[in-house]
């Protein structure tokens, strides 16, 4: 690195003529695509994809699923579902975005009838971005709270009530009264200075200090969704800080976020390794790992359909397919990038990270069970309960607890941030494709404006009822909508556009392959993956249960609102299909057929990559084509 030179990230202002390239932060001098820009290095792309795929679910959901579904035996259906559902869809989306150099909405020039699928993906990313940054705000709050000599949730402090206890609480017992015995409640026994007879005590479970801290201090949780309460000001400030970090990382688009992910994507692995080494040295660690993936593995669980459904669902959501982000990030690749090897690398990294994280989590939970005299099954949790109750409780009981807490919550922060970067990049990429000239001039204000709007929408999630809203959005928007989009995506591209034609498109990028190479991909794309996704969707609908949080059921209007959110996301699929059909020419059948053909400006973005197959395609970057053009019998390539 040259000395005394401004880094590219903060490029020095010089008196020079402003060019289109200098106006567009996405574009560098050496980029192949001077309109949209490319990743500066392939490692920028790979780390961004790893950061997007590897998120909070790898740490707080996968280990719990493995434990509850047979331990090590769960890895068998997990690996099978990766091969049958996760990897095929992941490879398809990466190839799609890279081939056309377009984001999740404009890429549907491939099949204009299905443009609404892309809109659905972007809307789901918007909803998820709202609540995902709230989780990052929780992590920031706990990170700041950890900078104390004693962790605030280490003991039952002034905020706790009489239920706060690490040991079971005595509710009553038998006492000697005269010549006989009577069962009395413990408050009466204590008031009268009596002593319980040995073995007669009746216990009820207490609430851990970390649990009450989470409910009473962090969330100031209300009694239900009906009681919104006030905005929790310190969570609102943490949410603002989270959005400022996201905005700062994305102000130059992929050129800046591609550098930030070198830290946010790699640092979690350092922390997981440190936590694993520390956990492995603690008493009881081997017991925790045994429950996770060792001698306690139960292979008879493989006979249960629920285990296979959990494996497929975890793979599907963990890889972030059908959110639009994979298409958006891949659209900035150079045309001849080997997206096949990239898909393999990212998918395997994601799955191995999940397994690795489980060892770090369960080694320390095993120690927590050991010192509290409980079984591992009594301390293991999932989701928020693992991240903000069980694991903080375990860390509070370690020597130098604040240090380990700082490491853990900083890891959660970085895990969440790089996933959030990709979600926002999905939104800005959509604007980039629809309004390229405006984005060249106003990328920074548009990006910051997007962050500001999402921050304001997220304030509802940091009220005293905020956690209920977070769960509601997650339960509805991050579920069925994604499954529906994924099924239509693979059906539209493989069954309508044509799987063999799509394979020819891929070979234009990565080179021709022998027929046996595509045998597996054809089997998955044409048959196996759509069937699996459909089965998961049907299963999820059949097994639908009224959402609740902490055993508090959601009100009728809350459930109805959840359905309205998911309908709002997917309604654009039929709406855009109808619009395209109305705009087309001919009778109804001719209109539908014409809308199922690729648009005249579908194909490789740059002319030098089009070859004979796409030599007559219209120019994709023309301003008049910033939306998918109407398909009609009279449409001719320009």
Swiss-Prot record:
Keyword hit for Transmembrane: yes
Native species: Mus musculus (Mouse)
Tissues expressing the protein: Expressed in the distal region of the intestinal tract: cecum and colon.
InterPro entries associated with the record: Na/ntran_symport (IPR000175), SNS_sf (IPR037272)
Role description: Amino acid transporter that plays an important role in the absorption of amino acids in the intestinal tract. Mediates the uptake of a broad range of neutral and cationic amino acids (with the exception of proline) in a Na(+)/Cl(-)-dependent manner. Transports non-alpha-amino acids such as beta-alanine with low affinity, and has a higher affinity for dipolar and cationic amino acids such as leucine and lysine. Can also transport carnitine, butyrylcarnitine and propionylcarnitine coupled to the transmembrane gradients of Na(+) and Cl(-).
Spans within the Extracellular topological domain: 131-230
Known glycosylation sites: 155, 163, 174, 185, 193, 198, 298
GO annotation terms (biological process): (R)-carnitine transmembrane transport; amino acid import across plasma membrane; beta-alanine transport
Alphabetized UniProt keyword annotations: Amino-acid transport, Cell membrane, Glycoprotein, Membrane, Symport, Transmembrane, Transmembrane helix, Transport
Protein name: Sodium- and chloride-dependent neutral and basic amino acid transporter B(0+)
Reaction equations catalysed: glycine(out) + chloride(out) + 2 Na(+)(out) = glycine(in) + chloride(in) + 2 Na(+)(in); L-leucine(out) + chloride(out) + 2 Na(+)(out) = L-leucine(in) + chloride(in) + 2 Na(+)(in); L-glutamine(out) + chloride(out) + 2 Na(+)(out) = L-glutamine(in) + chloride(in) + 2 Na(+)(in); L-arginine(out) + chloride(out) + 2 Na(+)(out) = L-arginine(in) + chloride(in) + 2 Na(+)(in)
UniProt membrane topology term: Multi-pass membrane protein
Family note: Belongs to the sodium:neurotransmitter symporter (SNF) (TC 2.A.22) family. SLC6A14 subfamily.
Superkingdom of this protein's organism: Eukaryota
